[in-house]
Amino acid sequence: MKGLALCLVLSMATTMAFAAGGAEAAPASPAKSWDFAKETPLADVRIRQALAYAIDMKTITETLFEGLASPARSMTNVGAWQSPKLTEYAYNPQKAKELLAAVQWPADYVLDVVTYYADQQTADFLTTVQDYLSKVGVQMKWRLLEGDLAAQLWVAPADMVNGPSVVKWDLAYAAVAASAESEFYVRYGSTAPNNSHTPKDEVMDKLLEGLNVVDVNTQIKAMHAVQERLNEKLYSIPLYHQIAFIYVGNLLDIKGTVHGNDQFSYEKNILNWEIKRADGTMYTNTGPKEFWEAPITNPGLYAYQEYLFDKLINADASLTPTTGMLAKSYTVSPDGLKFVFDLKTDVKWHDGKPFTAEDVKFTIEFMARTNSFAAVNYKSIVGAEDYVAKKADGISGIVIDGNKVTVTFAKVNPNASLVFSQWPMLPRHLLKDSDPMTTQTDQFWQKPIGTGPFKAGEFVRNNYAVLERFDGYYRKGTGNIQKIFMSASGDNDPNLMVNAEAGKIDYAWSKSTADAKAIGKLPNFTVTKAPIRYTRFFHINQFPHMPNVK
């Protein structure tokens, strides 16, 4: 905590030093009457550019994040997949003031900034941004969202051209943990079910279509074009790229498991892990808070999502799809349009019911009607668009023949294998009457049932939850873990250091640089840096909406 406080002081001091050179007040905005029911200043690209110019991300990453994050020019990190033609919106408060004056920014408007991160580093970051914006004449207040986040953040307007907005915020401090590069960008399409922020852009829609190719070089060129459009229009403000940290205590033997991106599911062989505790309990973080989050927006962010639910296909530490999981085997046609899954016949749900091909068909159809990256990909299946539009009773491109399920895509989807390895199967017999758009409120998610190696046990809201080894699992393993005790947290765990010192962490992960430094000093932990495809940014709500802060 002291380190974070010091970083914040340094950041604030740097801010004031920069501001001192041009200390004149921002030019007074000429009076303009804004009809917020029909327009928002945030729809003007100059306002979005001004906000970007006003924030010194170089200083913030060097101080607050202690050099363990890097300023972002796009959602994609530096490398072959990032376009070399992108404009860098480097810190320039005078430019920000000029742009705000040109658009007649309403000086009494207070930006309503929301986030779902409850850790101290987020509070420090947003307080620092608040200070930067005030230097150019922009007021801002931020607040923490709780409860059903998808309903508060990612509901698209009925009219993607004119709005109005469904969500109630100006800026959302959020992140994308992308399983594939395209996952960063599909949310800007006018048909994306989670596009709550960016009005229809026909040019962007066409560029996004260009990502649906298999050849890597062609896909990279298409990705560059999408990035350049987003960089020009600045529909969101990329802030910084982060790495993750994985912590393993000395009581746990993970038997050579290769660390990967713990924001997603990959083969950890947890059934072979051994814990030096007589009761076989392993302690970890990322447990449920108010409820067990449905694996829709985040299919593997929380520990329980990976251990409660299995997928059709397995993946290795690099998230490359490998062998079958719930599928005994699978094949892909040479043109990449047809997947055939030969399902295992000895799989049971945690309530003892058999897992069947009907569960596979149900899950894909269920997910196609959600606000998720999976839905965007499933809509490429033959007949999916008619099903989502309620013009058909099912997706015609999904065909069941005994224990075999054939899924036929209407067009090449380079992310299909990835989606099948990340989004789990769900029980038809328990969720068939649940509305996909509001499923998080279903009683099922108070104690979910999956096909994974562990089943849901005791749950104390905003405190902890317990997973118990499932005796009916189709694989056995050689390890001795009988229970997993999960402290309630997101991917930035405010109690991680406290729990580590108290002996209540054996395996955990987070993105907090402060935690990484502190836990790294403990003699009984190994800390591993894990490169991840992860970018924090500000989503900007460009649909008409009334001011939330009065």
Tell where the protein language model's regions lie, with residue ranges.
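Ligand-site clamp/hinge motif
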Residues: 26, 139, 442-445, 472-518, ...
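Aromatic- and charge-enriched surface segment that lines or borders ligand/interaction sites
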Residues: 41-43, 328-374, 406, 499-502
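N-terminal lobe/hinge region of extracytoplasmic solute-binding protein
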Residues: 284-332, 365, 449
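A bilobed periplasmic-binding-protein/Venus flytrap-type ligand-binding module shared by bacterial periplasmic
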Residues: 29-47, 63, 207, 242, ...
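A structural "hinge/loop" feature
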Residues: 35, 40, 247-265, 286-306, ...
